Design a protein with these regions (language model features):
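Bacterial N-terminal signal peptides that target proteins for export
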Residues: 1-9
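Sec/Tat signal peptide C-region and signal peptidase I cleavage site
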Residues: 19-24
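Bacterial N-terminal signal peptides
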Residues: 8-18
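Active-site histidine-anchored catalytic micro-motif
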Residues: 25-133
Length: 133
């Protein structure tokens, strides 16, 4: 009986998390905005533009087919990331695959957000549902 009660409580808690993060509406709310990066769109855009303007990466011989970029807080890794993004800024890129660790829950394997969008301070980033599914 205690196990059933605990299971019911866990289900309600999990459902609450879905609504808090916007998963029920298909929009994943930002969890770290204001901590790892600016939550204010104007300030975030200015910070990103500043990093990109200061970046002057060396040219790359050959075709760029992928980019590995740090994902730490922008104050720590933004300038380094900007060097990579400057290299691909003018390329015709239709899909970006973002791979990163979970900072909220530990688990084995991987998790793929199958459909919807990620809310960012700069707007929605749609999931490529055909690739995700």
């Amino acid at each position: 009986m205690k196990i059933k009660a605990a299971a019911v409580v866990l289900i309600f808690l999990a459902a609450g998390l879905l609504f808090d993060t916007g998963l029920a509406q298909g929009i994943r709310k930002p969890v770290w905005a204001g901590q790892f990066y600016e939550s204010d769109p104007t300030r975030l855009a200015y910070l990103i533009d500043s990093f990109l303007q200061a970046a002057n990466p060396s040219s790359v011989q050959g075709q760029i087919v992928g980019l590995v970029s740090p994902h730490a807080g922008y104050i720590y890794s933004g300038q380094i990331a900007a060097h990579g993004y400057q290299l691909v800024r003018n390329l015709d890129i239709s899909t970006v695959v973002i791979i990163g660790p979970s900072h909220q829950v530990g688990f084995e394997g991987c998790s793929i957000y199958l459909k919807g969008s990620f809310q960012t301070p700069l707007g929605l980033a749609a999931v490529a549902e055909i690739l995700a599914g």
